[in-house]
Amino acid sequence: LLNNDTKILDKDSLGDMLGYCMRPEVGIVGSKLIYGDGTIQHAGVILGLGGIAGHAFIGLDAKEYGYMSRAYLSCDYTAVTAACLMVPKAVFDEVGGLCEEYAVAFNDVDLCMKVRSKGYLVVYDAFSQWYHYESKSRGYEDTPEKQLRFKGEIETFQSKWQKELDEGDPYYNRNFPMTTEAYVLASE
């Protein structure tokens, strides 16, 4: 899956993703996405961050390592964004593909959750790097209609994955708060 508002940064990015996808235990691979200003837009998704799911390291300089080098190293996550995502066709078919109940938001997180529920890994590939001109494809949630749709998608996700939301993201330290940016300790 690839948004029309992305641009490849490294010619080896697709080959790198394919390498992970060829491992039988891997179900999905996502890329590092970088804003035009050189900061990170996506380096993995944390389940429950900000309520449903949030991007790790958003706004961090793309050359920075981040907490325990997780922004700079390929590693497993609960989810990755579909703005640039590779999934073997057999895995995609096995889980029933994208859920049509999500017109815009959370379809990628839902797909990753379904893939993980089948025992596959979701991998963030830090070496597959793309520019992402976010919201050029989907726009912003800036009208009452879009906000109502977004609220409905939140409710759909919660009804389907509440148990997993309650249990917390297995790849995220429970000592970090879920209401602020990822990997930052809250002040008391």
Language model region names:
Residues 29-32, 125-126, 133:
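Short glycine/serine/threonine-enriched helix-capping/active-site loop
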Residues 6-50:
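Conserved donor NDP-sugar-binding/catalytic core segment of glycosyltransferases
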Residues 18, 44, 112-113, 154-158:
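Non-transmembrane alpha-helical segments in soluble domains
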Residues 131-137:
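Short acidic (Asp/Glu) and glycine-rich catalytic loops that position anionic groups and cofactors
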Residues 14-17, 71-96, 101-131:
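A short, conserved alpha-helix in the catalytic core of glycosyltransferases
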Residues 27, 37, 49-76, 122, ...:
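C-terminal, non-catalytic tails of nucleotide-sugar-dependent glycosyltransferases
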